[in-house]
Amino acid sequence: MRLSQMLFVTLRDDPSDAEIPSHKLLLRAGYIRRIGSGIYAYLPLMWRVLQKVSQIVREEMNATGAQECLLPQLQPSELWKESGRWDTYTKAEGIMFSLIDRREQQLGLGPTHEEVITAIARDMIRSYRQLPLHLYQLQTKFRDEIRPRFGLMRGREFIMKDGYSFHVDEDSLKKTYQDMYQAYSNMLRRAGLAFRPVEADSGAIGGSGSTEFMVLAEAGEDEVLYTDDGKYAANVEKAVSLPADAEPSQFTTFEKRETPGTETIEKVTQFLKASPTQIVKNVLYQTAYDNGVTVLVLVIIRGDQEVNEVKLQNELTKLAANYGAKAIISLTVPSAENQQTWTAKPLPLGYIAPNIADEYIAANKQIHPKFVRFVDKTVVDLKNFITGANEAGCHVVGANWGEQFPLPEIVVDVRKARPGDRAVHDSTQLLKSARGIEVGHIFQLGTKYSQALGATYTNEQGEEKPLVMGCYGVGVSRLAQSAVEQSYDKDGIIWPVAIAPYHAIVTIPNINDAQQVEIAEKLYTELNQSGVETLLDDRNERAGVKFKDADLIGIPYRIVTGRAITNGKVEIVERATRQSQEIPIDEVITTLQQWIRAAIEQKN
Protein backbone atom coordinates (compact mmCIF):
# COMPACT_ATOMS: atom_id res chain seq x y z
CA MET A 1 0.00 0.00 0.00
CA ARG A 2 1.21 3.50 -0.84
CA LEU A 3 0.94 6.05 1.94
CA SER A 4 0.06 8.67 -0.66
CA GLN A 5 -3.15 6.72 -1.34
CA MET A 6 -3.97 5.68 2.22
CA LEU A 7 -6.24 7.44 4.71
CA PHE A 8 -3.24 8.39 6.80
CA VAL A 9 -3.14 11.38 9.14
CA THR A 10 -0.80 11.63 12.13
CA LEU A 11 -0.84 14.07 15.03
CA ARG A 12 2.22 15.70 16.55
CA ASP A 13 0.67 16.29 19.99
CA ASP A 14 -1.08 13.96 22.40
CA PRO A 15 -4.90 14.25 22.31
CA SER A 16 -6.14 15.94 25.47
CA ASP A 17 -8.72 13.26 26.28
CA ALA A 18 -6.28 10.32 26.07
CA GLU A 19 -4.98 9.11 29.43
CA ILE A 20 -2.57 6.22 28.86
CA PRO A 21 0.32 5.89 26.37
CA SER A 22 -1.29 3.27 24.12
CA HIS A 23 -4.47 5.34 23.73
CA LYS A 24 -2.45 8.46 22.90
CA LEU A 25 -0.28 6.65 20.39
CA LEU A 26 -3.11 4.89 18.54
CA LEU A 27 -4.85 8.24 18.10
CA ARG A 28 -1.68 10.13 17.15
CA ALA A 29 -0.59 7.45 14.68
CA GLY A 30 -3.94 7.41 12.89
CA TYR A 31 -4.94 3.88 13.88
CA ILE A 32 -8.25 4.81 15.51
CA ARG A 33 -10.61 7.79 15.63
CA ARG A 34 -12.99 8.63 18.46
CA ILE A 35 -16.60 8.86 17.29
CA GLY A 36 -18.26 9.14 20.70
CA SER A 37 -17.73 8.16 24.32
CA GLY A 38 -16.24 4.67 24.23
CA ILE A 39 -16.90 4.39 20.47
CA TYR A 40 -14.03 4.22 17.98
CA ALA A 41 -13.51 3.76 14.26
CA TYR A 42 -10.83 1.25 13.30
CA LEU A 43 -8.91 2.90 10.47
CA PRO A 44 -6.99 0.95 7.78
CA LEU A 45 -3.79 0.35 9.76
CA MET A 46 -5.72 -0.74 12.86
CA TRP A 47 -7.97 -3.02 10.87
CA ARG A 48 -4.94 -4.90 9.58
CA VAL A 49 -3.70 -5.35 13.16
CA LEU A 50 -7.11 -6.63 14.24
CA GLN A 51 -7.25 -9.03 11.31
CA LYS A 52 -3.88 -10.48 12.29
CA VAL A 53 -4.89 -10.87 15.92
CA SER A 54 -8.15 -12.49 14.79
CA GLN A 55 -6.26 -14.91 12.54
CA ILE A 56 -4.02 -16.04 15.40
CA VAL A 57 -7.12 -16.53 17.55
CA ARG A 58 -8.86 -18.52 14.79
CA GLU A 59 -5.88 -20.76 14.21
CA GLU A 60 -5.52 -21.62 17.88
CA MET A 61 -9.25 -22.20 18.33
CA ASN A 62 -9.53 -24.35 15.22
CA ALA A 63 -6.55 -26.42 16.37
CA THR A 64 -8.58 -27.51 19.41
CA GLY A 65 -11.50 -28.66 17.26
CA ALA A 66 -13.72 -25.67 18.04
CA GLN A 67 -16.11 -24.60 15.26
CA GLU A 68 -16.64 -20.99 14.22
CA CYS A 69 -20.15 -19.57 13.94
CA LEU A 70 -21.85 -16.18 14.19
CA LEU A 71 -24.58 -15.43 16.72
CA PRO A 72 -27.11 -12.56 16.69
CA GLN A 73 -26.19 -9.30 18.36
CA LEU A 74 -29.85 -8.55 19.15
CA GLN A 75 -31.09 -10.86 21.90
CA PRO A 76 -34.67 -11.30 23.19
CA SER A 77 -35.13 -10.37 26.84
CA GLU A 78 -36.99 -13.64 27.45
CA LEU A 79 -33.75 -15.64 27.27
CA TRP A 80 -32.06 -13.38 29.81
CA LYS A 81 -35.08 -13.53 32.08
CA GLU A 82 -34.91 -17.33 31.94
CA SER A 83 -31.31 -17.22 33.14
CA GLY A 84 -32.13 -14.60 35.78
CA ARG A 85 -29.63 -12.07 34.41
CA TRP A 86 -31.92 -9.52 32.72
CA ASP A 87 -32.33 -7.29 35.75
CA THR A 88 -28.68 -7.66 36.77
CA TYR A 89 -27.52 -6.53 33.33
CA THR A 90 -30.10 -3.80 32.64
CA LYS A 91 -30.81 -2.18 36.02
CA ALA A 92 -28.68 0.00 38.30
CA GLU A 93 -25.07 -0.53 37.20
CA GLY A 94 -25.92 -3.14 34.56
CA ILE A 95 -23.89 -3.01 31.36
CA MET A 96 -26.40 -4.17 28.74
CA PHE A 97 -27.86 -1.77 26.19
CA SER A 98 -31.56 -2.56 26.12
CA LEU A 99 -34.28 -1.33 23.79
CA ILE A 100 -37.93 -1.81 22.89
CA ASP A 101 -38.83 -2.51 19.28
CA ARG A 102 -41.95 -1.31 17.41
CA ARG A 103 -43.86 -4.37 18.63
CA GLU A 104 -43.11 -3.41 22.25
CA GLN A 105 -40.72 -6.35 22.63
CA GLN A 106 -37.69 -5.91 24.90
CA LEU A 107 -34.30 -6.65 23.35
CA GLY A 108 -30.70 -6.41 24.46
CA LEU A 109 -27.53 -5.70 22.48
CA GLY A 110 -25.31 -8.64 23.31
CA PRO A 111 -22.56 -8.02 25.86
CA THR A 112 -22.08 -11.81 25.94
CA HIS A 113 -23.88 -14.83 24.51
CA GLU A 114 -24.38 -17.53 27.15
CA GLU A 115 -28.16 -17.34 26.88
CA VAL A 116 -28.28 -17.47 23.09
CA ILE A 117 -25.86 -20.38 22.75
CA THR A 118 -27.63 -22.32 25.51
CA ALA A 119 -30.96 -21.84 23.74
CA ILE A 120 -29.40 -23.21 20.56
CA ALA A 121 -28.00 -26.20 22.44
CA ARG A 122 -31.40 -26.78 24.04
CA ASP A 123 -32.97 -27.04 20.61
CA MET A 124 -30.25 -29.00 18.80
CA ILE A 125 -28.39 -31.25 21.24
CA ARG A 126 -30.25 -34.42 22.15
CA SER A 127 -27.74 -37.18 22.85
CA TYR A 128 -24.40 -37.78 24.55
CA ARG A 129 -23.19 -38.88 21.11
CA GLN A 130 -23.18 -35.20 20.02
CA LEU A 131 -20.83 -34.24 22.86
CA PRO A 132 -18.44 -32.65 23.55
CA LEU A 133 -19.20 -29.67 21.30
CA HIS A 134 -17.39 -26.33 21.15
CA LEU A 135 -18.60 -23.28 19.18
CA TYR A 136 -16.99 -19.85 18.97
CA GLN A 137 -17.43 -16.53 17.20
CA LEU A 138 -15.55 -13.30 16.54
CA GLN A 139 -17.98 -10.44 16.79
CA THR A 140 -18.63 -6.89 17.94
CA LYS A 141 -19.93 -6.74 21.50
CA PHE A 142 -21.73 -3.88 23.27
CA ARG A 143 -21.43 -2.86 26.92
CA ASP A 144 -22.83 0.29 28.47
CA GLU A 145 -19.76 1.03 30.57
CA ILE A 146 -20.33 3.50 33.39
CA ARG A 147 -17.02 5.17 32.60
CA PRO A 148 -15.62 4.32 29.17
CA ARG A 149 -11.90 5.07 29.21
CA PHE A 150 -8.47 4.27 27.84
CA GLY A 151 -9.54 3.93 24.21
CA LEU A 152 -10.10 0.31 23.20
CA MET A 153 -9.34 -0.93 26.73
CA ARG A 154 -12.78 -0.10 28.08
CA GLY A 155 -15.08 0.84 25.24
CA ARG A 156 -18.80 0.54 24.75
CA GLU A 157 -18.32 -1.32 21.48
CA PHE A 158 -15.46 -3.76 20.95
CA ILE A 159 -14.39 -6.91 19.13
CA MET A 160 -14.32 -10.15 21.08
CA LYS A 161 -13.86 -13.85 20.53
CA ASP A 162 -16.27 -15.78 22.71
CA GLY A 163 -16.55 -19.55 22.75
CA TYR A 164 -18.90 -21.98 24.49
CA SER A 165 -18.44 -25.70 25.09
CA PHE A 166 -20.94 -28.41 26.03
CA HIS A 167 -20.11 -31.65 27.85
CA VAL A 168 -21.54 -34.73 29.50
CA ASP A 169 -19.62 -34.21 32.75
CA GLU A 170 -17.06 -32.14 34.66
CA ASP A 171 -14.15 -34.32 33.52
CA SER A 172 -14.90 -33.56 29.88
CA LEU A 173 -15.27 -29.86 30.69
CA LYS A 174 -11.92 -29.79 32.51
CA LYS A 175 -10.17 -31.27 29.48
CA THR A 176 -11.54 -28.53 27.21
CA TYR A 177 -10.74 -25.96 29.90
CA GLN A 178 -7.11 -27.11 29.86
CA ASP A 179 -7.12 -27.05 26.05
CA MET A 180 -8.32 -23.44 26.19
CA TYR A 181 -5.72 -22.57 28.82
CA GLN A 182 -3.04 -23.77 26.41
CA ALA A 183 -4.69 -22.17 23.36
CA TYR A 184 -4.93 -18.79 25.11
CA SER A 185 -1.31 -19.03 26.21
CA ASN A 186 -0.37 -19.79 22.60
CA MET A 187 -2.40 -16.83 21.30
CA LEU A 188 -0.70 -14.33 23.57
CA ARG A 189 2.75 -15.79 23.06
CA ARG A 190 2.33 -15.71 19.27
CA ALA A 191 1.12 -12.11 19.47
CA GLY A 192 4.40 -11.21 21.18
CA LEU A 193 2.97 -10.31 24.58
CA ALA A 194 4.32 -10.84 28.11
CA PHE A 195 1.42 -12.22 30.14
CA ARG A 196 0.46 -14.11 33.27
CA PRO A 197 -2.50 -16.49 33.77
CA VAL A 198 -4.12 -15.81 37.16
CA GLU A 199 -6.91 -17.22 39.29
CA ALA A 200 -9.95 -15.01 38.92
CA ASP A 201 -13.43 -14.28 40.20
CA SER A 202 -16.18 -15.47 37.86
CA GLY A 203 -18.30 -12.34 38.36
CA ALA A 204 -21.70 -12.09 36.68
CA ILE A 205 -20.81 -14.91 34.27
CA GLY A 206 -20.77 -17.38 37.14
CA GLY A 207 -19.41 -20.90 37.39
CA SER A 208 -17.11 -22.90 39.61
CA GLY A 209 -13.72 -21.63 38.49
CA SER A 210 -12.03 -19.26 36.09
CA THR A 211 -8.64 -18.04 34.87
CA GLU A 212 -7.81 -14.58 33.55
CA PHE A 213 -4.97 -13.93 31.14
CA MET A 214 -3.27 -10.69 32.11
CA VAL A 215 -0.98 -8.72 29.84
CA LEU A 216 1.52 -7.13 32.20
CA ALA A 217 1.55 -3.33 31.96
CA GLU A 218 1.77 -0.45 34.43
CA ALA A 219 -1.42 1.08 33.00
CA GLY A 220 -3.41 -2.09 33.69
CA GLU A 221 -6.68 -1.62 35.56
CA ASP A 222 -6.28 -4.90 37.44
CA GLU A 223 -3.94 -5.72 40.30
CA VAL A 224 -2.32 -9.15 40.22
CA LEU A 225 -0.84 -10.75 43.34
CA TYR A 226 1.79 -13.42 42.75
CA THR A 227 4.70 -15.27 44.33
CA ASP A 228 8.26 -15.45 43.06
CA ASP A 229 8.22 -19.26 43.03
CA GLY A 230 5.70 -19.15 40.16
CA LYS A 231 3.20 -21.33 42.02
CA TYR A 232 0.57 -18.69 42.72
CA ALA A 233 -0.96 -15.78 40.83
CA ALA A 234 -4.44 -14.32 41.22
CA ASN A 235 -6.45 -11.23 40.52
CA VAL A 236 -6.69 -9.25 43.76
CA GLU A 237 -10.49 -9.78 43.59
CA LYS A 238 -9.92 -13.52 44.00
CA ALA A 239 -6.60 -13.70 45.84
CA VAL A 240 -6.22 -15.44 49.18
CA SER A 241 -3.36 -15.13 51.64
CA LEU A 242 -2.33 -15.49 55.26
CA PRO A 243 -2.60 -12.21 57.17
CA ALA A 244 0.00 -11.10 59.67
CA ASP A 245 -0.42 -12.69 63.09
CA ALA A 246 -2.48 -10.71 65.56
CA GLU A 247 -0.57 -9.13 68.42
CA PRO A 248 -1.48 -10.32 71.94
CA SER A 249 -4.04 -8.10 73.65
CA GLN A 250 -3.01 -6.09 76.69
CA PHE A 251 -6.61 -6.18 77.94
CA THR A 252 -7.44 -9.18 80.12
CA THR A 253 -10.66 -7.90 81.70
CA PHE A 254 -13.86 -7.03 79.86
CA GLU A 255 -14.99 -3.46 80.39
CA LYS A 256 -16.55 -0.53 78.59
CA ARG A 257 -14.30 2.45 77.97
CA GLU A 258 -15.22 5.97 77.01
CA THR A 259 -13.43 6.69 73.72
CA PRO A 260 -14.78 10.02 72.45
CA GLY A 261 -14.01 11.03 68.88
CA THR A 262 -12.66 7.60 67.87
CA GLU A 263 -14.88 6.68 64.92
CA THR A 264 -11.96 5.28 62.91
CA ILE A 265 -9.56 2.41 63.52
CA GLU A 266 -6.61 4.79 63.50
CA LYS A 267 -8.14 7.01 66.17
CA VAL A 268 -9.19 4.18 68.49
CA THR A 269 -5.76 2.52 68.28
CA GLN A 270 -4.11 5.81 69.22
CA PHE A 271 -6.57 6.46 72.04
CA LEU A 272 -6.24 2.97 73.57
CA LYS A 273 -2.57 2.54 72.56
CA ALA A 274 -3.47 -0.78 70.96
CA SER A 275 -2.69 -2.64 67.75
CA PRO A 276 -5.34 -2.67 64.99
CA THR A 277 -4.89 -6.47 64.96
CA GLN A 278 -6.61 -6.51 68.38
CA ILE A 279 -9.73 -4.75 67.06
CA VAL A 280 -12.90 -6.32 65.71
CA LYS A 281 -14.39 -3.76 63.33
CA ASN A 282 -17.95 -3.97 62.06
CA VAL A 283 -18.54 -2.66 58.55
CA LEU A 284 -22.10 -1.94 57.44
CA TYR A 285 -23.31 -2.60 53.88
CA GLN A 286 -26.67 -2.68 52.18
CA THR A 287 -27.44 -4.88 49.22
CA ALA A 288 -30.37 -4.66 46.83
CA TYR A 289 -31.60 -7.88 45.22
CA ASP A 290 -33.34 -8.17 41.87
CA ASN A 291 -36.76 -8.69 43.48
CA GLY A 292 -36.64 -5.31 45.23
CA VAL A 293 -35.64 -6.60 48.67
CA THR A 294 -32.88 -4.74 50.52
CA VAL A 295 -30.76 -6.60 53.05
CA LEU A 296 -28.51 -4.96 55.64
CA VAL A 297 -25.15 -6.66 56.05
CA LEU A 298 -22.65 -6.47 58.90
CA VAL A 299 -19.12 -7.61 58.03
CA ILE A 300 -17.11 -8.40 61.14
CA ILE A 301 -13.40 -8.28 60.32
CA ARG A 302 -10.04 -7.56 61.95
CA GLY A 303 -9.17 -3.90 62.31
CA ASP A 304 -6.07 -3.99 60.12
CA GLN A 305 -7.85 -5.67 57.20
CA GLU A 306 -10.02 -4.41 54.33
CA VAL A 307 -13.21 -5.96 52.98
CA ASN A 308 -12.97 -7.46 49.50
CA GLU A 309 -16.34 -6.42 48.09
CA VAL A 310 -16.16 -8.92 45.23
CA LYS A 311 -15.83 -11.78 47.71
CA LEU A 312 -18.61 -10.23 49.80
CA GLN A 313 -20.93 -9.98 46.81
CA ASN A 314 -20.28 -13.62 45.99
CA GLU A 315 -21.27 -14.64 49.53
CA LEU A 316 -24.43 -12.56 49.32
CA THR A 317 -25.30 -14.07 45.94
CA LYS A 318 -25.26 -17.50 47.60
CA LEU A 319 -27.98 -16.23 49.96
CA ALA A 320 -30.19 -14.73 47.23
CA ALA A 321 -32.67 -17.63 47.26
CA ASN A 322 -33.25 -17.05 50.99
CA TYR A 323 -34.88 -13.74 50.06
CA GLY A 324 -36.74 -15.00 46.99
CA ALA A 325 -34.18 -13.42 44.66
CA LYS A 326 -31.77 -14.58 41.97
CA ALA A 327 -29.14 -11.88 41.78
CA ILE A 328 -27.73 -8.76 43.37
CA ILE A 329 -28.42 -5.38 41.78
CA SER A 330 -26.14 -3.30 44.01
CA LEU A 331 -23.86 -3.50 47.04
CA THR A 332 -22.97 -0.26 48.80
CA VAL A 333 -21.87 1.25 52.07
CA PRO A 334 -25.07 3.13 52.97
CA SER A 335 -24.82 6.90 53.03
CA ALA A 336 -26.47 8.92 55.79
CA GLU A 337 -29.33 9.64 53.38
CA ASN A 338 -29.79 5.94 52.58
CA GLN A 339 -29.76 5.01 56.24
CA GLN A 340 -32.73 7.27 56.87
CA THR A 341 -34.83 5.07 54.58
CA TRP A 342 -34.45 1.99 56.78
CA THR A 343 -33.28 2.92 60.30
CA ALA A 344 -35.75 3.00 63.16
CA LYS A 345 -33.31 5.08 65.22
CA PRO A 346 -29.87 6.62 64.60
CA LEU A 347 -27.00 4.14 64.39
CA PRO A 348 -23.92 4.53 66.61
CA LEU A 349 -21.68 4.77 63.56
CA GLY A 350 -18.03 4.14 64.36
CA TYR A 351 -19.04 2.36 67.56
CA ILE A 352 -21.12 -0.56 66.25
CA ALA A 353 -20.63 -3.94 67.95
CA PRO A 354 -21.02 -7.40 66.39
CA ASN A 355 -24.33 -7.86 68.23
CA ILE A 356 -26.02 -4.62 67.20
CA ALA A 357 -29.75 -5.14 67.61
CA ASP A 358 -32.00 -5.88 64.66
CA GLU A 359 -34.41 -3.32 66.16
CA TYR A 360 -32.36 -0.60 64.46
CA ILE A 361 -34.04 -1.72 61.21
CA ALA A 362 -37.44 -0.08 60.69
CA ALA A 363 -40.42 -2.23 59.70
CA ASN A 364 -40.67 -2.16 55.91
CA LYS A 365 -41.78 -4.98 53.64
CA GLN A 366 -38.98 -4.15 51.19
CA ILE A 367 -36.31 -4.27 53.93
CA HIS A 368 -35.28 -7.59 55.47
CA PRO A 369 -35.89 -7.21 59.23
CA LYS A 370 -32.57 -8.71 60.39
CA PHE A 371 -28.92 -7.96 59.79
CA VAL A 372 -26.99 -10.61 57.90
CA ARG A 373 -23.79 -11.03 59.91
CA PHE A 374 -20.66 -12.31 58.18
CA VAL A 375 -17.68 -12.98 60.42
CA ASP A 376 -14.35 -13.02 58.62
CA LYS A 377 -11.87 -15.76 59.48
CA THR A 378 -9.39 -13.15 60.75
CA VAL A 379 -11.41 -12.54 63.93
CA VAL A 380 -12.62 -16.05 64.80
CA ASP A 381 -9.64 -16.81 67.05
CA LEU A 382 -9.16 -13.33 68.53
CA LYS A 383 -9.20 -13.16 72.32
CA ASN A 384 -9.64 -10.17 74.61
CA PHE A 385 -10.39 -7.98 71.61
CA ILE A 386 -11.58 -4.40 71.26
CA THR A 387 -14.83 -3.56 69.49
CA GLY A 388 -17.67 -1.05 69.49
CA ALA A 389 -20.04 -0.79 72.44
CA ASN A 390 -23.18 0.11 70.40
CA GLU A 391 -22.97 3.48 72.10
CA ALA A 392 -21.55 6.65 70.60
CA GLY A 393 -18.18 7.53 72.12
CA CYS A 394 -17.63 4.11 73.70
CA HIS A 395 -15.75 0.87 72.96
CA VAL A 396 -15.38 -2.35 74.91
CA VAL A 397 -12.04 -4.02 75.62
CA GLY A 398 -11.14 -7.55 76.72
CA ALA A 399 -14.09 -9.05 74.83
CA ASN A 400 -14.34 -12.70 73.81
CA TRP A 401 -16.54 -14.81 71.56
CA GLY A 402 -18.94 -17.03 73.46
CA GLU A 403 -18.76 -14.77 76.50
CA GLN A 404 -19.72 -11.18 75.75
CA PHE A 405 -20.56 -11.76 72.07
CA PRO A 406 -21.99 -14.78 70.26
CA LEU A 407 -19.90 -15.81 67.26
CA PRO A 408 -22.08 -15.35 64.13
CA GLU A 409 -22.87 -18.56 62.27
CA ILE A 410 -21.65 -17.48 58.83
CA VAL A 411 -17.84 -17.61 58.83
CA VAL A 412 -16.30 -16.47 55.53
CA ASP A 413 -13.15 -15.20 53.87
CA VAL A 414 -14.00 -11.70 52.68
CA ARG A 415 -10.70 -9.98 53.46
CA LYS A 416 -8.66 -8.35 50.75
CA ALA A 417 -5.29 -10.00 50.18
CA ARG A 418 -2.46 -7.52 49.72
CA PRO A 419 1.23 -7.33 48.88
CA GLY A 420 3.44 -8.53 51.71
CA ASP A 421 0.95 -11.13 52.94
CA ARG A 422 2.22 -14.69 53.29
CA ALA A 423 1.16 -17.16 50.60
CA VAL A 424 -1.23 -19.95 51.53
CA HIS A 425 0.74 -22.63 49.67
CA ASP A 426 4.05 -21.63 51.29
CA SER A 427 4.18 -19.19 54.19
CA THR A 428 7.80 -18.31 53.38
CA GLN A 429 6.64 -16.84 50.06
CA LEU A 430 5.35 -13.26 50.23
CA LEU A 431 2.79 -11.90 47.79
CA LYS A 432 4.02 -9.32 45.31
CA SER A 433 1.96 -6.96 43.16
CA ALA A 434 1.87 -6.20 39.44
CA ARG A 435 -0.55 -4.36 37.18
CA GLY A 436 -2.26 -6.22 34.38
CA ILE A 437 -4.71 -5.80 31.50
CA GLU A 438 -7.25 -8.60 31.29
CA VAL A 439 -7.34 -9.74 27.67
CA GLY A 440 -8.72 -13.25 28.13
CA HIS A 441 -10.95 -15.09 30.59
CA ILE A 442 -11.96 -18.74 30.65
CA PHE A 443 -14.75 -20.14 32.84
CA GLN A 444 -16.00 -23.50 34.04
CA LEU A 445 -19.72 -22.70 34.03
CA GLY A 446 -21.03 -26.09 35.05
CA THR A 447 -24.82 -26.35 34.73
CA LYS A 448 -25.77 -22.78 35.72
CA TYR A 449 -27.21 -21.83 32.32
CA SER A 450 -28.30 -25.25 31.11
CA GLN A 451 -30.43 -25.77 34.21
CA ALA A 452 -31.89 -22.26 34.02
CA LEU A 453 -32.85 -22.67 30.34
CA GLY A 454 -33.63 -26.38 30.41
CA ALA A 455 -30.83 -27.47 28.06
CA THR A 456 -30.43 -31.22 28.52
CA TYR A 457 -29.09 -34.32 26.79
CA THR A 458 -29.85 -38.02 27.14
CA ASN A 459 -26.98 -40.08 28.59
CA GLU A 460 -26.02 -43.68 27.81
CA GLN A 461 -28.52 -44.93 30.38
CA GLY A 462 -31.34 -43.01 28.73
CA GLU A 463 -31.47 -40.44 31.55
CA GLU A 464 -32.03 -36.74 30.88
CA LYS A 465 -29.18 -34.64 32.28
CA PRO A 466 -28.30 -30.91 32.14
CA LEU A 467 -25.48 -30.00 29.78
CA VAL A 468 -22.19 -29.12 31.49
CA MET A 469 -20.79 -25.91 30.01
CA GLY A 470 -17.66 -23.80 29.71
CA CYS A 471 -17.12 -20.37 28.16
CA TYR A 472 -14.00 -18.66 26.91
CA GLY A 473 -13.46 -15.02 25.91
CA VAL A 474 -10.65 -12.99 24.31
CA GLY A 475 -10.86 -9.25 23.80
CA VAL A 476 -9.44 -8.91 20.29
CA SER A 477 -9.42 -5.11 20.16
CA ARG A 478 -8.20 -4.87 23.76
CA LEU A 479 -5.39 -7.33 23.02
CA ALA A 480 -4.24 -5.16 20.12
CA GLN A 481 -4.05 -2.03 22.26
CA SER A 482 -2.40 -4.01 25.07
CA ALA A 483 0.46 -4.81 22.70
CA VAL A 484 1.05 -1.07 22.31
CA GLU A 485 0.83 -0.47 26.05
CA GLN A 486 3.53 -3.07 26.54
CA SER A 487 5.82 -1.95 23.73
CA TYR A 488 6.44 1.69 22.86
CA ASP A 489 9.06 4.40 23.31
CA LYS A 490 9.22 8.19 23.20
CA ASP A 491 8.90 8.16 19.41
CA GLY A 492 5.94 5.85 19.00
CA ILE A 493 4.60 2.32 18.79
CA ILE A 494 6.81 -0.79 18.56
CA TRP A 495 4.55 -3.51 17.16
CA PRO A 496 5.41 -7.18 17.66
CA VAL A 497 6.20 -8.50 14.19
CA ALA A 498 3.36 -11.06 14.21
CA ILE A 499 0.59 -8.47 14.56
CA ALA A 500 2.15 -5.38 12.98
CA PRO A 501 -0.03 -3.94 10.20
CA TYR A 502 2.91 -4.26 7.80
CA HIS A 503 6.30 -5.92 8.17
CA ALA A 504 8.26 -3.17 6.47
CA ILE A 505 8.02 0.37 5.17
CA VAL A 506 10.10 1.61 2.25
CA THR A 507 10.89 5.29 2.74
CA ILE A 508 11.94 7.52 -0.16
CA PRO A 509 13.85 10.46 1.39
CA ASN A 510 13.64 12.54 -1.80
CA ILE A 511 10.87 11.78 -4.28
CA ASN A 512 12.57 14.08 -6.79
CA ASP A 513 15.53 11.69 -6.98
CA ALA A 514 14.66 9.31 -9.81
CA GLN A 515 17.12 6.63 -8.66
CA GLN A 516 15.70 6.60 -5.11
CA VAL A 517 12.19 6.31 -6.49
CA GLU A 518 13.08 3.56 -8.96
CA ILE A 519 14.81 1.39 -6.34
CA ALA A 520 12.04 1.99 -3.81
CA GLU A 521 9.33 1.04 -6.31
CA LYS A 522 11.19 -2.14 -7.26
CA LEU A 523 11.73 -3.17 -3.63
CA TYR A 524 8.13 -2.36 -2.74
CA THR A 525 6.78 -4.57 -5.52
CA GLU A 526 9.17 -7.48 -5.00
CA LEU A 527 8.87 -7.50 -1.21
CA ASN A 528 5.09 -7.74 -1.39
CA GLN A 529 5.31 -10.46 -4.04
CA SER A 530 7.66 -12.43 -1.77
CA GLY A 531 5.26 -12.29 1.19
CA VAL A 532 6.87 -9.39 3.06
CA GLU A 533 3.94 -7.05 3.68
CA THR A 534 5.30 -3.64 2.78
CA LEU A 535 4.21 -0.01 2.79
CA LEU A 536 5.70 2.58 0.47
CA ASP A 537 6.10 6.12 1.79
CA ASP A 538 5.95 7.99 -1.51
CA ARG A 539 4.50 11.19 -0.06
CA ASN A 540 5.88 14.57 -1.04
CA GLU A 541 7.17 15.26 2.48
CA ARG A 542 10.54 16.03 4.02
CA ALA A 543 12.64 12.99 4.96
CA GLY A 544 12.48 13.93 8.65
CA VAL A 545 8.68 13.89 8.61
CA LYS A 546 8.68 10.47 6.97
CA PHE A 547 11.15 9.04 9.48
CA LYS A 548 9.12 10.38 12.41
CA ASP A 549 5.91 8.94 11.00
CA ALA A 550 7.57 5.56 10.44
CA ASP A 551 8.67 5.51 14.08
CA LEU A 552 5.25 6.67 15.26
CA ILE A 553 3.26 3.97 13.46
CA GLY A 554 5.70 1.30 14.61
CA ILE A 555 6.37 -0.76 11.46
CA PRO A 556 9.08 -3.30 12.47
CA TYR A 557 11.56 -2.58 9.62
CA ARG A 558 12.24 0.68 7.78
CA ILE A 559 14.03 0.50 4.43
CA VAL A 560 15.57 3.80 3.35
CA THR A 561 16.59 4.36 -0.26
CA GLY A 562 19.01 7.15 0.65
CA ARG A 563 22.71 7.79 0.12
CA ALA A 564 23.62 4.11 0.49
CA ILE A 565 22.14 3.37 -2.94
CA THR A 566 25.26 4.83 -4.55
CA ASN A 567 27.04 1.76 -3.14
CA GLY A 568 24.28 -0.62 -4.24
CA LYS A 569 22.82 -0.79 -0.75
CA VAL A 570 19.88 0.45 1.30
CA GLU A 571 19.66 1.24 4.99
CA ILE A 572 17.41 -1.01 7.09
CA VAL A 573 16.45 0.19 10.57
CA GLU A 574 14.89 -2.20 13.07
CA ARG A 575 12.19 -0.31 14.98
CA ALA A 576 12.52 -2.26 18.23
CA THR A 577 16.29 -1.89 18.68
CA ARG A 578 17.06 1.17 16.51
CA GLN A 579 19.88 -0.85 14.99
CA SER A 580 20.73 0.22 11.45
CA GLN A 581 22.43 -1.86 8.77
CA GLU A 582 23.32 -1.27 5.15
CA ILE A 583 22.21 -4.28 3.13
CA PRO A 584 22.95 -4.94 -0.57
CA ILE A 585 19.79 -4.28 -2.55
CA ASP A 586 19.68 -7.78 -3.98
CA GLU A 587 19.80 -9.27 -0.45
CA VAL A 588 17.01 -7.18 1.07
CA ILE A 589 14.22 -9.67 0.40
CA THR A 590 16.00 -12.74 1.78
CA THR A 591 17.32 -10.77 4.75
CA LEU A 592 13.89 -9.49 5.74
CA GLN A 593 12.28 -12.88 5.22
CA GLN A 594 14.82 -14.41 7.61
CA TRP A 595 14.38 -11.67 10.21
CA ILE A 596 10.59 -11.84 10.10
CA ARG A 597 10.55 -15.62 10.27
CA ALA A 598 12.96 -15.60 13.23
CA ALA A 599 10.93 -12.93 15.08
CA ILE A 600 7.68 -14.87 14.67
CA GLU A 601 9.14 -18.31 15.39
CA GLN A 602 10.78 -17.00 18.56
CA LYS A 603 7.28 -16.40 19.98
CA ASN A 604 5.78 -19.74 18.88
Swiss-Prot record:
Enzyme kind, highest EC tier: ligase
Pfam families noted in UniProt? HGTP_anticodon, tRNA-synt_2b, tRNA_edit
What EC numbers are recorded for this enzyme? 6.1.1.15
Keyword terms: Aminoacyl-tRNA synthetase, ATP-binding, Cytoplasm, Ligase, Nucleotide-binding, Protein biosynthesis
Compartments in which it is found: Cytoplasm
User: Which spans are transmembrane here?
Assistant: none
Under CDD domains, the record lists: ProRS-INS (cd04334), ProRS_anticodon_short (cd00861), ProRS_core_prok (cd00779)
Keyword NAD attached:
no
GO BP, sorted A to Z: prolyl-tRNA aminoacylation
A GO molecular function annotation here is: proline-tRNA ligase activity
Major localization listed first in the record, in broad terms:
cytoplasm
Which Cys pairs does UniProt list as disulfide-bonded? none
Reaction(s) catalysed (UniProt annotation): tRNA(Pro) + L-proline + ATP = L-prolyl-tRNA(Pro) + AMP + diphosphate
Q: Does the keyword rRNA processing apply?
A: no
Cite the InterPro entries for this sequence.
aa-tRNA-synt_IIb (IPR002314), aa-tRNA-synth_II (IPR006195), aa-tRNA-synth_II/BPL/LPL (IPR045864), Anticodon-bd (IPR004154), Anticodon-bd_dom_sf (IPR036621), Pro-tRNA-ligase_IIa (IPR002316), Pro-tRNA-synth_IIa_bac-type (IPR004500), Pro-tRNA-Synthase_IIa_type1 (IPR023717)
Concerning its family, UniProt says: Belongs to the class-II aminoacyl-tRNA synthetase family. ProS type 1 subfamily.
**Record's comment describing the protein's domains:** Consists of three domains: the N-terminal catalytic domain, the editing domain and the C-terminal anticodon-binding domain.
Subunit structure, per the record? Homodimer.
Q: Which HAMAP family match?
A: Pro_tRNA_synth_type1
What is the protein's known function? Catalyzes the attachment of proline to tRNA(Pro) in a two-step reaction: proline is first activated by ATP to form Pro-AMP and then transferred to the acceptor end of tRNA(Pro). As ProRS can inadvertently accommodate and process non-cognate amino acids such as alanine and cysteine, to avoid such errors it has two additional distinct editing activities against alanine. One activity is designated as 'pretransfer' editing and involves the tRNA(Pro)-independent hydrolysis of activated Ala-AMP.
Q: What is this protein called?
A: Proline--tRNA ligase
Q: What is the lineage of its organism?
A: Bacteria, Bacillati, Cyanobacteriota, Cyanophyceae, Nostocales
